[in-house]
């Protein structure tokens, strides 16, 4: 490394073979001893020390600032500037084309639409409005007819069953049977809707549980019980049923197996 300081030029720009040759020649020349010996200058027009050749090199002339890159010709610069806008337009068109979604097959479109129409669960203590703005899911009956889910909350389905039942009340299984009888959608729907019915029965202000034996009904087990609609439940259902729009009533009627009994069930 120290011997390279005594070269008259740099070798980094040379090929590997020429660099080795320059180092070989350098080994044959003994570098001067430091400090440099003073020699008498007969002309007396300069220093008495013979400096190294690198001391006479101006680094700004060898590697001027900003001149390490090859200058681009004017015609090359014009061609490059004309190419860049075309490249930008091509990138923009590619990005716009990537944003366009490919059409999905019909089966995947129906599946995606069904997932997007599932209503979110309500927070504890909150009641769902009677109106359902989402598109209703549908189910196919064994007869081949397509039944839509009624635009009603589970509270209203349970209240319909209890309002149109004997005063003694109904069991959970009887509530299931009433719902499947009047709304065929639940005949082929997944069994998870039954869990939702049992969950809504826990609303103490709308429903009450009474032992079956106290009402004189037939007991099927030691823990059998019946469910009844409380006064608060009657008041809430009547209030919300009166606020139904005509379009909602038509949708409910289309979801019923016997559309003619709708006025009697809702007491309209």
Swiss-Prot record:
One of its GO terms (cellular component) is cytoplasm. Disruption phenotype: Reduced survival with the majority of mutants dying during embryonic development and only 23.5% of mutants living to postnatal day 21. Surviving newborns are smaller and lighter than their wild-type littermates. Newborn brains display decreased cortical thickness and enlarged ventricles. SMART domains: FH. Expressed in adult germ cells (at protein level). Expressed in heart, liver, lung and embryonic brain. GO terms for biological process: brain development; positive regulation of transcription by RNA polymerase II; regulation of transcription by RNA polymerase II. Residues 149-248 bind DNA. Transcription factor which acts as both an activator and a repressor. Activates transcription of a number of genes including the heat shock chaperones HSPA1A and HSPA6 and the antioxidant NADPH-dependent reductase DHRS2 which are involved in protection against oxidative stress. Required for normal brain development. This is Forkhead box protein R1. It comes from Mus musculus (Mouse).
